[in-house]
């Protein structure tokens, strides 16, 4: 009896684990499909051409199973079949006006669907996003620290080159030429006759070597 209860408890634990694994897989798949649908709806410009507002991937699988049971071949409802009409499709019941009216409600329903699934899957795995990851800006270089100290002195002017004074003589001012009267001619030489005559008149006659004759000595 104890072995039977033990085996039954082990089976119930296994069933619980399998159920929890299946729930996790379904929540991940639903969050993945909802995330892909949300990113596709943001990227699509014309919503009226490609929007399937109230249908998800799981609903389409259920509809396909209802239309085509496992015994029948789904290829029978192809374009070559004359009995097939577009009224049999899922999208034929919706007109363009219905799609336009359903777009805000569908977005609200998607947001309501996404929020609990994301809350469930937040503890397990993050939902994949198709948008590019934001690249972080490179860090700015640090600002240069202010230098505390005296201001640098202005550069000195170059020293004058010494010039030799011997090579260059300073320019002297030119003196003006003063032109006066012509110099006088010297007098002509006097004749010896006149000289002798003059001496004879001024000097007494010398007669012998007497003291009287040389009074000036």
UniProtKB/Swiss-Prot annotation:
Q: Positions of the region Interaction with host H2A/H2B?
A: 81-84
Compositional bias segments (type: Acidic residues): 43-79, 89-102
Sorted alphabetically, the Gene Ontology cellular component annotations on this record are:
host cell nucleus; host cell perinuclear region of cytoplasm; viral tegument
Annotated region described as Interaction with host histones H3/H4, given as residue ranges: 63-64
Bias class Polar residues marks the residues at 32-42, 208-217
Keyword terms: Chaperone, Host cytoplasm, Host nucleus, Virion, Virion tegument
Does Chaperone show up as a keyword for this record? yes
- Signal peptide (residue range): none
- Location of this chain's protein in the cell: Virion tegument; Host nucleus; Host cytoplasm, Host perinuclear region
Region described as Disordered:
1-217
Primary place of residence? Answer: virion
Q: Compositional bias (Pro residues) at which positions? A: 136-145
User: In what ranges is there compositional bias, type Low complexity?
Assistant: 106-132
Show the domain comment: Binds directly to histones through its N-terminal domain.
How it assembles, according to the record, is: Forms a complex with the host H3/H4 dimer and histone chaperone ASF1. Also forms a complex with host H2A/H2B dimer. Interacts (via C-terminus) with BGLF2; this interaction is important for infectious virion production.
Q: What does this protein do?
A: Histone-binding protein that binds to histones H2A/H2B, H3/H4 and cellular chromatin to overcome the host DNA damage response triggered by the viral genome ends. Interferes with histone ubiquitination and recruitment of repair proteins.
The family assignment reads:
Belongs to the lymphocryptovirus BKRF4 family.
Q: Which protein, by its recorded name, is this? A: Tegument protein BKRF4
Natural source organism: Epstein-Barr virus (strain GD1)
Where is the organism placed in the taxonomic lineage, from the top?
Viruses, Duplodnaviria, Heunggongvirae, Peploviricota, Herviviricetes
């Amino acid at each position: 009896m104890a072995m039977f209860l033990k085996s039954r408890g082990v089976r119930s634990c296994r069933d619980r684990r399998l159920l929890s694994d299946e729930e996790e897989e379904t929540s991940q798949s639903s969050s993945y499909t909802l995330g892909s649908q949300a990113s596709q709806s943001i990227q699509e410009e014309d919503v009226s051409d490609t929007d399937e507002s109230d249908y998800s991937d799981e609903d389409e699988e259920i509809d396909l199973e209802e239309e085509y049971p496992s015994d029948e071949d789904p290829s029978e409802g192809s374009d070559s079949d004359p009995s097939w009409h577009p009224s049999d499709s899922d999208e034929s019941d919706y007109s363009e006006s219905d799609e336009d009216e359903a777009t805000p409600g569908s977005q609200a329903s998607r947001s309501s669907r996404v929020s609990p699934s994301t809350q469930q899957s937040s503890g397990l795995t993050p939902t994949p996003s198709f948008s590019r990851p934001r690249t972080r800006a490179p860090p700015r270089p640090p600002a240069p620290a202010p230098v505390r100290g005296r201001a640098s002195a202005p550069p000195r002017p170059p020293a004058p080159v010494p010039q030799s004074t011997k090579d260059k003589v300073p320019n002297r001012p030119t003196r003006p030429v003063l032109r006066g009267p012509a110099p006088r001619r010297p007098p002509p030489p006097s004749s010896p006759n006149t000289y002798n005559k003059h001496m004879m008149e001024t000097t007494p006659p010398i007669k012998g070597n007497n003291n009287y004759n040389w009074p000036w000595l």
